[in-house]
Amino acid sequence: MTTVPSTTTKVGIPGEGVAAVATTAPRRGPSIGKAFAWIVFVIAFLYFFLPLLGTFFHSIKTRPDIFLAYRQVLGDPKFFGGLLYSFVVGVITIIVSLAIIVPTAYWVRLKVPRMRPVVEFVTLMPFVLPPVVMVFGLIRVYSSKPLVLTGTNFGSDVLLVCAYVILSFPYMYRAVDTGLAAIDARTLTEAAQSLGSGWARVILRVIFPNIRTALLSGAFLTLAIVIGEYTIANFLARTAAFGPYLSLLGRNQPYQPAAVSLISFGLTWIAMVIIAGIGRGTRSRVQVAGAR
């Protein structure tokens, strides 16, 4: 630890001696807080990295061909089919969830702030309601007249997306609400309306660009949940979704599930990076303009 020598300042009137002496305390070198932050970072890194490393070592235990599990997984058409199906369902879920959550959170914050606790309580309901209860309720209600959806593939897909939208409410609403809290939504709205913009234009051209980071955060969480979800997809997916496929593979194969987990982990992160890149690439200055 390095120290800085103390300095002494003499204060007085010329010819009358020194009136006061001020001594500055020695300053410490490296901050203890910075060292503690690095320790926490290293512990967190090992906490997330070591399980991945252990999974990788387990996946290459196939002898003599250590990458046999990866070749078998990549050669299975059900792997890419299930992953693509879950990814598409996840993207649709994100779009529908944003279309519901963003206007709701914006209107509550702008017009009816007293309803905010009620909306927060409603968005937390998926944490209380188990997915198996939700899926059996959907099947029971929509398997009989007047609205039969479980009898067709399209109807089952619609129910699946609706269930995932409900599951995404806690994560998406928290992300959007945090983004709205970071901007002055009222001033932006008044400025846009003073230039002749309607509510739809304000939300699409003013609010959305200013909470882009929050929207991407909620989208990432939603996509990760949809791709790995098992219970609802097992009952409603018209084809083998990725979650049920991974569960079925784990019952019959010892090493392939580890390979699937690592491959899907990498592909999911690649998809998230692409989405983030698209969001940053399309970033533009907010234009507050009325109709001409």
Model regions and ranges:
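Membrane-water interface segments at the C-terminal ends of transmembrane alpha-helices
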Residues: 32-63, 75-181, 206, 210, ...
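The alpha-helix within a helix-turn-helix
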Residues: 192
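Short hydrophobic, aromatic-rich alpha-helical segments embedded in or entering the lipid bilayer
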Residues: 64-75, 237-250
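Alpha-helical transmembrane segments of bacterial inner-membrane membrane proteins
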Residues: 17-22, 26, 59, 64-76
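Glycine/proline-centered hinge or cleavage motifs at structural transition points of membrane proteins
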Residues: 195-196, 209
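Transmembrane alpha-helical segments of polytopic membrane transport and secretion proteins
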Residues: 1-40, 116, 274-292
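Short glycine/proline-centered loop/turn elements that form peptide/ligand docking sites
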Residues: 184-188
